[in-house]
Design a protein with these regions (language model features):
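C-terminal accessory/tail domains of diverse enzymes
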Residues: 1-73, 87-89, 93-240
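Active-site histidine-anchored catalytic micro-motif
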Residues: 75-77
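Basic amphipathic recognition helices
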Residues: 206, 253-256
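A generic structural signal for well-ordered alpha-helical surface patches
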Residues: 215-218, 253, 268
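Short alpha-helical segments that sit at the start of domains
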Residues: 237-254
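Short helix-capping/hinge SLiMs at alpha-helix to coil transitions
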Residues: 259-262
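Short acidic, hydrophobic short linear motifs in intrinsically disordered regions
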Residues: 264-274
Length: 275
């Protein structure tokens, strides 16, 4: 499956107008320049959605070269965010053709292209992605080993809590398991933009670093979808409850045991049993 993506590059050293004019003069399409209130960030470059392929790689190389040519710099607190669509391209849709249509649509309307997308991934898949990313956070060759110290458990991308992810079974519960927008994986755009935002990467205007990180995230999702999730099986999540968390014989314990039974219990049955 091919999931589309978009990038957000925070830079320093150039004003928004300078950046906007520089991209326009170089005829670079598919990007807009917006304000960012983070300290030391003077402009943020936001791409339209793209599907990974030669056309997307070419656009990212163009904007990278342009920013370097214009004299953009990166401060230690600059970030690089990646939005990945929660829905893959439909079967048979060419990635390069989709990217070209997305850029054209963005240039003509200022809006993001969302045609030819399949059904969104379900909670089981995104939960596995969040679990694996968080599980890999520390340790040898973990996420943190790829990032400078300034991007490790920082306030703009707080590390998720593994136990909260494990306890979540729905998209809403997974959203609640994060720290909101300022999380390593932000699920707030799920309903507003149909994307998952990965916020932890360090700021960069080097195309190789941008593309490597995008590929890493896309591979993370692909591996979960293709090798860890049984696509043919029921997506019902089993959640085991404790046999008896209450004092034996206590009224609440009797109620709990009755409700935990396979067929549950009616209100009348519980009232008859407990008085």
């Amino acid at each position: 499956m091919t999931y589309t993506f978009g990038i957000e590059l925070e830079i320093s050293g150039l004003s928004q107008q300078e950046t906007r004019s520089g991209l326009l003069n170089r005829n670079i399409k598919g990007f807009k320049v917006v304000n960012d209130d983070s300290h030391g960030v003077t402009a943020e470059i936001v791409s339209c959605p793209m599907a990974y392929g030669m056309d997307a790689m070419e656009q990212i190389n163009k904007v990278s070269n342009a920013l370097q040519d214009m004299g953009a710099t990166i401060m230690s607190n600059c970030g690089f965010h990646v939005h990945i669509s929660n829905a893959p391209l439909m079967d048979g849709v060419d990635a390069n053709d989709w990217t070209r249509k997305s850029i054209e649509h963005f240039e003509n309307t200022g809006n993001y292209y969302s045609e030819n997308l399949s059904d969104p991934m379900d909670a089981v898949l995104i939960k596995d992605v969040m679990y694996r990313y968080t599980k890999m956070q520390n340790g040898y060759n973990g996420i943190n080993s790829m990032l400078p110290r300034s991007r490790r458990d920082m306030t703009m991308a707080r590390v998720l809590v593994l136990e909260k992810i494990e306890a979540a079974n729905t998209i809403r519960e997974l959203q609640s398991a994060t720290h909101g927008k300022f999380s390593t994986i932000n699920l707030q755009p799920w309903t507003t933009h149909g994307t998952i935002e990965f916020r932890q990467a360090a700021g960069t205007i080097e195309a190789d670093k941008i593309l490597h990180w995008v590929r890493f995230l896309l591979n993370l999702i692909d591996h979960s979808a293709n090798y860890r999730i049984d696509q043919s099986a029921s997506r019902e999540i089993q959640h085991n409850t404790p046999t008896q968390p209450f004092r034996r014989g206590a009224r609440v314990g009797v109620q709990y045991t009755m409700m935990r039974a396979v067929d549950g219990a009616t209100t009348r049955q519980i009232m008859d049993a407990t008085g």
